Amino acid sequence: MSQTLQAVRGMNDVLPDEAEFWELFEDTIRSWLKGYGYRPIRMPIVEPTPLFKRAIGEVTDIVEKEMYSFVDGLNGEALTLRPEGTAGCVRAVIEHNLAARQTQRLYYIGQMFRHERPQKGRYRQFHQVGVESFGMAGPDIDAEMILMGARLWADLGLDGIELQLNSLGQPEERALHRAALITYFEENAELLDEDAKRRLHTNPLRILDTKNPAMQELCAAAPKLIDYLGAESLAHFEGVQRVLRDAGVPFTINPRLVRGLDYYNLTVFEWVTDKLGAQGTVCAGGRYDGLVEQLGGKPTPACGFAMGVERLIALIRESGGEPAAPAPDVYLVHQGEAAARQAFRVAEGLRDQGINVLQHCGGGSFKSQMKKADGSGATFAVIIGDDEAATGEAQLKSLRAEGSAQLKLKVDDLAEAIIGQLIDSDEEE
């Protein structure tokens, strides 16, 4: 007996009822992004492995432990399923010279892959909305991206999402802070866990992001990066805060917010909630002014953020925001050979007029078909038998208005009657 094949652990099917919800969510996202002038870009889900090692950093959890990497058996090329979208987007911007003559505002929606332990809100295949800008160096674009998040939460009817901010300064400022951190943690080496000891001389900033309760007090007393920032970095950070205060967007400065990728500088931010358990970050990003040059392009200021689709959808549901399932306008019932041929012509004619039609297939009695019509959620049933087919007519029955009369109409008059009743129904609501 053959083994039943199942989806890979941590990689989930999105079934029709759920996928319809996702489509509604993605439509909202695209409309929101276009309202800020962002344009779509689509990149491959497979990229050269060196891209992520150079962009994300060799000494990061993603590169060390979480990437799905393999060697192409045909040509020996090292490839990786993308664990995040920014590196691939920057690669595309450089390869196609997109930022040479003008600023760019880009977005993408798609799958990412990380070999993590699957749990609520964390999957091995997950979906992200990524938003990236190129060519804008001031704090205004940082602030705009944060304000975009605030508007989206309002549009989605979400509350309880809090904004945390920090500044990572410039590389030379981080170098001074790094030296101070190493000295501090070496002086308290007996309090470090094994992960912190491993990171101490490679990426000590990441120690501050530890989830180990036993190290929280130690990290809270560690040297703070903001004390090492120069005048320009401080002015940039204050510029972001000023816009947020003017817009009435509350925030908390979190000196331990460092992000898990090496390419960030200056502003970093996260939107977090306590409604999703341990996986509380729903949106995160910041500036990465050195990444384009680091990957072979010309020096280009850049800023971006990403949102987890699964987490946002879970948050919408947690907040009681389940949308109504979409339903067809018409369920087309037919019986008889002539009626079946007429049904195809009628269905296509109604679709030509923008009416959504679910046409019955598979035969069955009028009674069984009408039962399916009622269960479909359709507003109307259009009924065609051989008698109606012979005279070019059809029966129109409302499935939602109790006591309404069943009308016999010429096929050519169906669309006008349906559209008129749909408009009347919308006005009553």
Curated annotation (Swiss-Prot):
It is found in: Cytoplasm. One of its GO terms (cellular component) is cytoplasm. Its main location: cytoplasm. It is an enzyme of class 6 (ligase). GO terms for biological process: histidyl-tRNA aminoacylation. The keyword Aminoacyl-tRNA synthetase applies. One of its GO terms (molecular function) is histidine-tRNA ligase activity. Keywords: Aminoacyl-tRNA synthetase, ATP-binding, Cytoplasm, Ligase, Nucleotide-binding, Protein biosynthesis. It catalyses: tRNA(His) + L-histidine + ATP = L-histidyl-tRNA(His) + AMP + diphosphate + H(+). InterPro entries: aa-tRNA-synth_II, aa-tRNA-synth_II/BPL/LPL, Anticodon-bd, Anticodon-bd_dom_sf, His-tRNA-ligase, HisRS-like_core, HisRS/HisZ, HisRS_anticodon. It comes from the Bacteria. Its EC number is 6.1.1.21. Belongs to the class-II aminoacyl-tRNA synthetase family. Homodimer. This is Histidine--tRNA ligase. The gene is hisS.
